[in-house]
Every structure is written in C-alpha cells, then in structure tokens.
C-alpha cells in the first residue's frame, strides 16, 4: 500500500473566466491603424505583451447590458455558445474595458441614463455620447490553455476607431498605448499568438467590408494536449 505522505494531488485546473476584447481599426482598408497597449511588466497575466483593450466580465455588466441595443447578427453568433444574458454582458464589458484601459468611448452623439450611473455611464454623459454597441461585430473567440493558472474565455469584437472618440491615456493596465499600422505591429511588436490570431480575423473582415451576416462562422482558438486548434463555430 503506498505511503499516503508520498501521494501528491494533481493541481486543480483553473476555469476560464468570461472576458471581452475590442480590436479597434481605423483608416485604410488595406493597412489600417490598430489600437494596442503594452501590459505592465508586473502584470500577473501576459506581462510586457502588446494587447488590445479588454478584460473579464464583471457582475455589474449583466445589469448594465440588459437593455442595450445589439445587432441581431452579433447576438445570433454569440448565442451559439452562451446564453443571451451573457452575450449582452460581454458586449457591455467590451466597451467598458476599452474605456477603462484607453480612455476611448465607443459611442456617437446621444444621451444615456444616469440613474444606474456607473463611472462609464457618467463618462458617456459628460462627453454627450451614447454607447454605440451596434458598432461592435463579434469576430473571434480564444480559450487560454488548460495548463495555465490564469485562464480566460475571450470573445473578440471588431469596431471602427472612428467611432471611438476620446483622449488616449496610460492606465494601471496598459502602458505605451497608441495607434500603430497593422503591418508595423505584426512585424515590430511583441504579440502573443492569440493577439495575432484576432488581428488577422479582424483584418479579413475590415478589408472585405462584408455586410452583417448571422450565419457567418466565427473562428475559435483553443488547445488540446498542448496542440493549438483552430475551428469554426
């Protein structure tokens, strides 16, 4: 009988947390600019790496997203793998994280109700803008490998940077944030595979200028036995 003192429990796998990220492109259809920032060197997740604005879904996102307008085709694509309530929360988290990490508001002239006033609501109201959630297209999904201690189930959205006014600023999450040509970002910056994956998917749609399509399959990046898998869902 083995000595119990020698038995070692296998580490518990981290459950991937829901997260949202926005690929903001602007300008040229062939070689647009993309918004990227470098994660702090002391960050727990992907330190020193250039990424899009984004982060995990908060509990409050569910309440704030309850009545937001969402394109039918975007909702249809998200609902293939998550319930409607979570799909809406992901979209709200996407615009919230973009503002928190860059200072940019994905919006257009309009009003927003201050009654449930989060900091994001107040930022929109002060700028005379309303959230432009209809401007987001769901383009890709990536799940952090199972062996990682910190994992995310991230949905990537594409938005036009021309619809994201505001003054860029460094935050506690992202440093050296700014607009860069996609070609330069790919060749010169330290990008993770997942960032390159989402950027390539965004660039395809940006160049095609394809109309909304609820039947379009969405690329998903995941791993199995440490082998990267790219599938359509």
Regions found by a protein language model. Give the residues of each.
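Nudix hydrolase/Nudix homology domain
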Residues: 1-11, 17, 43, 73-80, ...
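Generic structural "secondary-structure junction" signal
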Residues: 47, 54, 59, 106, ...
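Conserved N-terminal beta-strand and adjoining loop/helix that marks the start
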Residues: 12-34, 43-67
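Conserved hydrophobic/aromatic beta-strand scaffold that supports enzyme active sites
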Residues: 21, 36, 49, 156-158, ...
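The catalytic Nudix box helix
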Residues: 52-54, 60-132
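Short loop segments at secondary-structure junctions
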Residues: 26-29, 40-41, 55-57, 108-109, ...
